[in-house]
Amino acid sequence: MVSPGYMSFELVATSEKDWKDAVIEAYNAAKKSVYGIRSIQILERDVKVKEDLDKLIYRVRVRVNFQIAEK
């Protein structure tokens, strides 16, 4: 019996609320494309400042790890 395989990909997500919300946005985007998500690793985070709009944009770069379906 072969143990299940795993794959990963990276993506960037944003939120005007906070980093937690940005991670939730990343999860919501990822689950539209893959299933069997096992973990989300935060690789980088920063805040983009939009002074002209008096706004902060929270950004996260994450790695999404998911299980490959067995046939």
Predicted regions and their residues:
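Short, well-ordered alpha-helical segments
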Residues: 2-40
